[in-house]
Amino acid sequence: MIDTQLPLTDLHRHLDGNIRPETILDLAQQHNIALPAYELETLRPHVQITKNEPSLVSFLQKLDWGVAVLADLDACRRVAYENVVDVANAGIDYAELRFSPYYMAMKHQLPIEGVVEAIIDGVQSALHTYDVEIRLIGILSRTFGENACQQELNGLLKHQDKITALDLAGDELGFPGHLFQPHFNRARDTGWKITVHAGEAAGAESIWHAIKELGASRIGHGVKAIEDPRLMDYLAEHQIGIESCLTSNIQTSTIASLAQHPLKKFLEHGIIASLNTDDPAVEGIELKHEYTVAAPAAGLTAAQIRQAQINGLTMAFISQAERDALIKKVSLG
């Protein structure tokens, strides 16, 4: 179901949600960090979804063991490097890797700017070996409050030329978007693109706010848009991209079943929506699964799946020249 003549993109992929279980074990051993289990198979239920979680917040707790082993900046470099390797091994041509430097720094009180630098270094190092296109998106983790997000933003701004966009993620219900308006005003002044997690745990009003007040040109998840016909029209008319993550939405119990997922209706409505992974290591999936298993289960036709693949390229935070180069590179094999 993947058109190999077209670039394959993953635009919603959390670097800190894709720390390999093997790496968690290895780093814990290196740094003498206590884990709930010390064998891969017994650790897996603690770091990977084995059954659907009751909420987004409980799903996010699975990520905590991955960042708990980031005891130094070398560990951050390693997971950044491995993220690029995983993108290449998944056959993805272009990925936007997003990360929250505060979340990664928090457990071991690492310098936030140092974490940003380590992520950039790890990615650049991997790109010497692996022929993929990578862009970085900084995340403000709303869960930790406005002050933490300001520290996060400051660290990201120190390397603003290496960061493509800013995102807002975390506890959408507990920390609504209006708290972070000053942060996003600053980000837009910098020239960054804006994508926001919205309409996942909260309703359609969260999406409206992300677009109108935070300046989002793309929305992460956005499933609750289906509840507001006026918003559906607006998304289509203004070409606001929806970064759909099918498996993730089931595992967080945001949507009860793939058959009920609104992605098909988004595409039928002319909304530019794409297929993405979210947190591959935590979910136990890769992008191919979203195309070959999840999308058909969500009722998408082969033509709609191909359209979602095209949409990924359309929505990507790159210039038209970069888009054309990517198309040419893939078509030439």
Curated annotation (Swiss-Prot):
The active site is at 200 (proton donor). It comes from the Bacteria. The record marks 221 as: Important for catalytic activity. The keyword Iron-sulfur does not apply. It holds the Pfam family A_deaminase. GO terms for biological process: adenosine catabolic process; hypoxanthine salvage; inosine biosynthetic process; nucleotide metabolic process; purine ribonucleoside monophosphate biosynthetic process. Its EC number is 3.5.4.4. InterPro entries: A/AMP_deam_AS (IPR006650), A_deaminase (IPR028893), A_deaminase_dom (IPR001365), Ado/ade_deaminase (IPR006330), Metal_Hydrolase (IPR032466). Its cofactor is Zn(2+). GO terms for cellular component: cytosol. NCBIfam families: aden_deam, PRK09358.1-1. Belongs to the metallo-dependent hydrolases superfamily. Adenosine and AMP deaminases family. Adenosine deaminase subfamily. This is Adenosine deaminase. The gene is add.
